[in-house]
Amino acid sequence: MSKIVKVLGREIIDSRGNPTVEAEVHLEGGFVGMAAAPSGASTGSREALELRDGDKSRFLGKGVLKAVEAVNGPIAKALLGQDAKDQANIDKIMIDLDGTENKSNFGANAILAVSLANAKAAAAAKGMPLYEHISDLNGTHGQYSMPLPMMNIINGGEHADNNVDIQEFMIQPVGAPTLKEAVRMGSEIFHHLAKVLKAKGMNTAVGDEGGYAPNLESNAAALAAIKEAVEAAGYVLGKDVTLAMDCAASEFYNNETGNYELKGEGKTFTSQEFTHYLEELTKQYLIVSIEDGLNESDWDGFAYQTKVLGDKIQLVGDDLFVTNTKILKEGIDKGIANSILIKFNQIGSLTETLAAIKMAKDAGYTAIISHRSGETEDATIADLAVGTAAGQIKTGSMSRSDRVAKYNQLIRIEEALGSKAPFNGLKEVKGQA
């Protein structure tokens, strides 16, 4: 009953108004899975390739008809008659057929959309929720947890049209007893932050990930505004709520000078100086997690940063590791960072994503399931976070349906699983248990 009878791809629109790939996988018995590939703005140079058409007469060159053709042509032909329950085989067929290291023939956007749609179809055929099927694929049947959200309530960098260099300023409602209560706390703080910003005469328009995107005098000013909002909402920073940042430092790294240039503050730092700049912010604002605190190729700098901060806070590799087990293994061997951000379109298939999560956990690293800045209503990452018991999720702010869709799916899953999926709060963050 799980034999593939049809694979269909189409071009749809993501949350930035750009095209992306959506795929359907149809099985015997009428079971169907549908999924869409997300898209990043600040991307690691070693990510799997997102195939775009380059035809300037359509979508300013960002069309994905070539990727869709790959789904409807060679991928569909190769998968017809295959068993959808054998996810590893489905992904291997597509990867082998593509034949490139970075999936540049078909595009990671094509392969991933089919990979996820296949998992959804297989779950339907098994008569179970997607998170349960993912738990089976992960070899951890029935081992669930609800993830601690990282809520990006001030957007900067490549995600916003403002003068703030650091890309994401996030809250983590660590004191909540449940995921649903964590969402409530995040929502309250989000609305109080709007009041704080308006009182300062600042803009409350939102960026790509649903957080506010005001012009600010410094990165510290963003943290100070959030601290004020946390307290206005009746919560205690460091007890009820902790802070996290995604620097996306590759975006303000000067390749010629080797320095980090915070243009919003008019400051320039060497690699070690920037680590100490971050160290001061962590002390002042009780930050427990920093992502991509240096340029993705600054491995010596990351080794130093891990030495200085790695036993105190979570140091997350995103552009650094790009959900790639080869790169992650090198990082683990060299003692670089202590956590990995998991974005399945960086690697391009569900099987490879699960392998990266397993490698991280086996090495004592945390794994944070993440959206991309270009999203759709597809909420697969919610099921992925629960089904792998990853422990943390990063899926934007408390506005924009492309972000809220994931929180709403998590609320539904928590309701269904109850005590089978505990919410562990701060214990999930590396160095904070």
From Swiss-Prot:
Cell location: Cytoplasm; Secreted; Cell surface
Gene Ontology MF term list: magnesium ion binding; phosphopyruvate hydratase activity
UniProt-recorded name of the protein: Enolase
NCBIfam families, alphabetized: eno (TIGR01060)
Cofactor(s) it depends on: Mg(2+)
Binding site for Mg(2+): 246, 291, 318
Result of altering residue 343 to T: Decreased enolase activity. Strongly reduced enolase activity
Record PTM text: Acetylated and 2-hydroxyisobutyrylated at Lys-326 and Lys-343, respectively, reducing the enolase activity. Deacetylated and de-2-hydroxyisobutyrylated by NpdA/CobB, increasing the enolase activity.
Gene3D superfamilies in UniProt: Enolase-like C-terminal domain, Enolase-like, N-terminal domain
Residues the entry annotates as binding (2R)-2-phosphoglycerate: 167, 343, 372-373, 394
Subunit record text: Component of the RNA degradosome, a multiprotein complex involved in RNA processing and mRNA degradation.
Role this protein plays: Catalyzes the reversible conversion of 2-phosphoglycerate (2-PG) into phosphoenolpyruvate (PEP). It is essential for the degradation of carbohydrates via glycolysis.
The record's free-text note on cofactor binding: Binds a second Mg(2+) ion via substrate during catalysis.
InterPro entries in the cross-refs: Enolase (IPR000941), Enolase-like_C_sf (IPR036849), Enolase-like_N (IPR029017), Enolase_C (IPR020810), Enolase_CS (IPR020809), Enolase_N (IPR020811)
Organism listed in the record: Proteus mirabilis (strain HI4320)
Alphabetized UniProt keyword annotations: Acetylation, Cytoplasm, Glycolysis, Hydroxylation, Lyase, Magnesium, Metal-binding, Secreted
Similarity field: Belongs to the enolase family.
GO BP field: glycolytic process
GO cellular component: cell surface; extracellular region; phosphopyruvate hydratase complex
Annotated catalytic residues: 209, 343
UniProt modified residues of type N6-acetyllysine: 326
Effect recorded for residue 326 to Q: Decreased enolase activity. Strongly reduced enolase activity
Catalytic activity: (2R)-2-phosphoglycerate = phosphoenolpyruvate + H2O
